[in-house]
Amino acid sequence: MVAGNNSSSHDAKDPSAGAEQIRSAITHLASARDLGELGTRIASVVLLSSPNDIQQMRRNFYEKIRNVTPEYRDCLEKKITEHLLGTWQTLRLMQQQGAFSAMNEPVPAGVNVYWEMVAVQCRGDGDELRLRFLKFLIAGFCMFVRNEPGHPAGTPFPGGGMVQYIDGVYYCPVKEKANDVDAALCPFCPALQTPAIGYLQPPLNPGLHQKQEFIRNCHDFHNFNG
């Protein structure tokens, strides 16, 4: 599945290839020394897929949420589809333009723990496994290379909350509520927990002191782990 590992794109998309190629890809990803290497290696795997694969992911996702309310389902499906297709295109453009070569920052802490989690979640075989790995690759690119949430700003959650981007900070209403879920992205996501409604609200257009005070208060009173 990874360029240079003697696995062709046909192998990567062959359901029989299964977990062995994924394990090889994860080992390659985990050895990346900086963000540029990580981005290049993620792109080399993701771009073996196509927009058709993204559409299949969308169809699979729709089946999972078909029983929720139509308003919530349609909003969520639209946002996730935009995110998946947009991230695939971003990876393609960054790879074509050589953008990763200028990214010399070290990989963030927690990257290897993330790939260990992905390895556990991507055991088995079949096309469903390949698409599951693709989902984790896209999320890893967003969280570690782009320093963006695994779920984009505007993603709605049950109860009316959504991921928000306010004054340079991402907030998520479920950041601290899913850490017991084995496959949750929350422990690795750079978003902060959305403050309780009516208690702490992000200041609009704050100065540096206000922003630092808000983040400090969020940490002290809400035990942020982002």
Give the location of each predicted region.
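Cysteine-centered metal-binding/redox modules
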Residues: 12, 16-226
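N-terminal acidic, proline/glycine-rich, low-complexity intrinsically disordered segments
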Residues: 1-7
